[in-house]
């Protein structure tokens, strides 16, 4: 007769089940970490999109300013325009001088500058913001690439 202990195979099975449980738990943790990383990347993408949208809004405003400035310096002297005074209200005003522009220099400080100088300053701000936008778009592209690399791993690990 065999002197084998009948409880031995049960212990082996129990140990094997315990090991599978540890691996499953480790797999669950890995999936959770991958999902957390994915959520973080998606949040960063959303933040960058918001930043790009804000930069685009400022660029659009600057282009509009440039367009109005160009028109007024060429055609505006003596014209009557509607000046916004807030809350959808306007007042008529006659343009007398198109040679200078009052421009904000920050901190509630404004400065009177020649129109051509104001135009150059606006163009310079547009160029700088377009560089910022390009940098943000590159970062967005990189994050999208990371998400596209991570998604298959999340699906693969999550399916196990």
From Swiss-Prot:
It is found in: Cytoplasm. One of its GO terms (molecular function) is unfolded protein binding. GO terms for cellular component: cytoplasm; prefoldin complex. Keywords: Chaperone, Cytoplasm. InterPro entries: PFD_alpha_archaea, Prefoldin, Prefoldin_subunit_alpha. The keyword Chaperone applies. Belongs to the prefoldin alpha subunit family. NCBIfam families: prefoldin subunit alpha. This is Prefoldin subunit alpha. The lineage of its organism: Archaea, Thermoproteota, Thermoprotei, Desulfurococcales, Desulfurococcaceae.
């Amino acid at each position: 007769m065999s002197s084998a202990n009948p409880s031995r195979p049960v212990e082996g099975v129990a140990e094997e089940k315990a090991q599978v449980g540890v691996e499953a738990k480790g797999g669950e943790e890995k999936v959770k970490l991958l999902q957390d990383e994915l959520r973080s990347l998606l949040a960063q993408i959303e933040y960058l999109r918001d930043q790009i949208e804000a930069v685009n809004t400022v660029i659009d405003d600057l282009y509009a300013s440039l367009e109005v400035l160009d028109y007024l310096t060429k055609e505006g002297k003596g014209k009557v325009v509607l000046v916004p005074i807030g809350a959808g209200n306007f007042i008529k005003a006659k343009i007398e001088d198109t040679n200078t522009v009052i421009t904000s220099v920050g901190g509630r400080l404004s400065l009177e500058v020649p129109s051509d100088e104001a135009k150059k300053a606006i163009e310079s701000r547009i160029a700088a913001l377009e560089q910022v936008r390009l940098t943000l778009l590159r970062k967005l592209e990189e994050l999208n690439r990371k998400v596209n690399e991570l998604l298959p791993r999340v699906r693969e690990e999550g399916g196990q």
